Amino acid sequence: MAYDQLKLQNQLCFRLYTASRLITQTYFPMLEKLGLTYPQYLVLMALWEEDGQKVMELAHRLYLDSNTMTPLVKRMASEGLVTRVKGKLDARETYVYLTDKAKELERQAASIPACMLGKVLSDR
């Protein structure tokens, strides 16, 4: 290769991508026990902080586009995790609210951050 700086392993973006993937994979067993995917967990964390957000606000907050966010929220609604409510003033807006099932998951998920920190620090 003529340009060493173009090697994949020399790219900051690739190293960050790899680290992100490894962290996400570390979450998998804990989230699987709760019946959640990582994107669902992110949505729930945002709603645990502030319930009743617009779909587009959630998308912006989680750095997701609407083509990803809308089906994710629909799937979560079909699984009984959230309810979707059309805006009273603008029917094009959809608000997302936690169900009792999702509120119970918050208690169960409370140990995940400490577990993750322990796993990340011990896997060296």
Question: Residue locations for each model-derived region?
Answer:
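Short, locally clustered residues in the helix-turn-helix/winged-helix DNA-binding domain
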Residues: Y17, M45-E49, A110
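Charged, amphipathic alpha-helical coiled-coil/dimerization segments
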Residues: T24, K74-R124
